[in-house]
Structures are given as C-alpha cells and as structure tokens.
Amino acid sequence: MNYKPLFSRALGLDPERLHFAAHSHHLWPDASFDGQVRAWAEANRFADRKWDLIFGEVIPEAQGHVARELSLPSPDSLIFAPNTHEILLRIVSAVDKAPVRILATDGEFHSFRRQSERWEEAGQAVVTRVPLAPFETFAERFVAAAQAGGHDLIFVSQVFFRTGGLFDRIAELAELADPAGPWVVVDGYHGFMATPTDLSTVADKIFYLAGGYKYAMAGEGACFLHAPPDFGPRPVVTGWFAEFGHLEGPPGGVQYRTDGGRFWGATFDASALYRFNAVRAMLDQHGLTTAMIADHARGLQARFQAAIEGGEAGGLSQADILNPVDGEAPRARFLALRHADAPRWKTALQEMNVIADVRDDVIRFGFSLYQSEEDVERLIHACARLD
C-alpha cells in the first residue's frame, strides 16, 4: 500500500530527499496543514471566545484520541502542555519531600537528564541512575532497584531514545506505586503511536507523558500527561487553567481540580491540538491503526537490517545494531547502529540528501508511512557508498 499521497505537501517540498528520520522530526501529513488553517480561522473568527471552543471541543476531542490510543479508562486524566519539560516540573513539584529521591536510568532524554542534574547540584534531588548497558539485564536490574525501595519517584522510558531498547516491565513498577510514594513516571515519547500501548491495567498507578512531535505526526506543542487519581493532588508549579472545573483544597488556600486537570498550566498555542485532531481523523478515515503502521515500518526495517547484515549497505555492516528486528515483538520505530564513524556517515548521507540522525556514536534510521519499499532500496544504494 502506498501512503505517500497522505504526505504530498511535505514530500513535494523536496521530492528527491530520502527522509529516514521519522523518529526525530516526523514529516507532517496533509491533514495537519488543514488543522493548522482551521486553528487560524477559528482563532480569528471567535477571537476572545476561542477558549470556550478550545476547552469545549478541541481539547475534549484530543483527550478522547489519546485515551482511546492508550486504553485509558477516562479522558479526564489527561492534560496538554507545550513540552514534556513543563510536565516534568509540575509532577516533581507535587512531591511533598525534599530532597526528592529519584530512581532513573543513564539513558533518559535530555529534558530529564539536564533537569535532574541541576536538581542534584541545587540539593533538590538525589538521583540514582541504573545503567542501560548491558541492556540484556537492564530490565531485571532496574526492577530490582525499584523493589529495593527508598525512592519517591521512579522515572523510566518506554522506549529509549538513543538505543531504541524497549522496557516491558511497567506493570511490575505499577505494583510498587502509591500516592505516598513512590510515584512511577513513564516517558512514552518514543512509544506513543509507535507501538501499540495498552495502559488499562496500570492507569490508576502510573504517570505517562508523551507528545505529538514524532509518531503522532502533529509537530511541536502537543505534549500530554496522563495522571493517575490521588497521586500529586497539589503541584506547586501550577497554572490558572488548573482552576477550571470541580475544585478542592484547604479553606482559603489554592484550589485544584480533582482529575488530571490539577496538572494544567496556563495559556498555550492550541494549534498543535488542531493538527493532532486532524491527523487522527485522517488515520480513522483510512482505517490506519498504530499496529498497522508499526507493521509497515517493521517490514521496511527488516529489509534494511538484512541489507546491513548482508553487506549491501557499505560501512554500516561494521556497526552494531543495538535494537535488531526480532520477529513480531513490539519495538522502536527506528534502527540504532553504533559505530565510531556514525557522525561521519550521517554527514555523508546528508550530502546525498538522505536524512538520518546521530546521537554520539549511534546513527538512527526512522521508518514510517511516507516511505516505500523502493525508498528503502534507494537508502541501501546510498549507504553502499559509505566506507
């Protein structure tokens, strides 16, 4: 099946480009353009009244899409924010202990990595980081560290951004979660709409954050948080949007919503939610599910992996594939290859108008709907020129 017509605007801007960085900046489908135009039109048509429309229609629609994607029991557990860093600050501000004792890994995305390092410098947190390597034993080591206790907050990625490794022991962490501590926070940015994710059995125990920049195909500004009931009822970092709805709190004190809305911030650019809703409507119209998209990407990944292992992809055959395709198992939507020449390969490919990206000594190739089997063959041909 050829899905390129859904991305005609983005692909038409550079028809010769091979974009294999869908895990980084996913190209936007045509539907997102229509959503952006609608956001502009409604902002100017309704002006000051647009927020009634946004909170009355746009946000509930987006909440519904996320809730259905993750099998959440209620969309009311969800809020949106411009980025996950804001969400992280609000969650940690709700921990009523100092310094906050955090269990994490050495492979978290920069939003958490940098902020947690600064909290440590300021004496506001004590962070224990479990090494990802060797990844074959990581899950066992991390769960054991969590079960050992002594933490207020446990932070871990569903899919690790650099290596593409997948953590599949969330349910065991959820068993440890308690409103009195520890809290479990899952960074799902490389999992949401990349691989089917069902949170129905852990939704009352874990925080889950992700966004629209990658596999949701909606661009920046559409990050979200699922907050379990009773965890963090009064975040210190709070915006005035958290005042809307049913409120509770001490007499004369700051009042909070009792659902996920207690983590709302303040005024934000809602156009990202218009794009997200438009993209989800497009997927529904074409009967495309996350499982179907993941299967399409898996087939492309498998062919590229076979070419690497078979010596068809030039110097890439010298690299270690950190997250190889393994049957039908859930996986990242990118292949991560480690080699000292990764930065040089990325630059050489870019000169051929082939887009991948690199993290230190890891080059990543991301796959999605707008790529075809022919594109993968062209990618292999380009990589064959790498030494």
Model-assigned labels for residue ranges:
Residues 1-387:
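Pyridoxal 5′-phosphate
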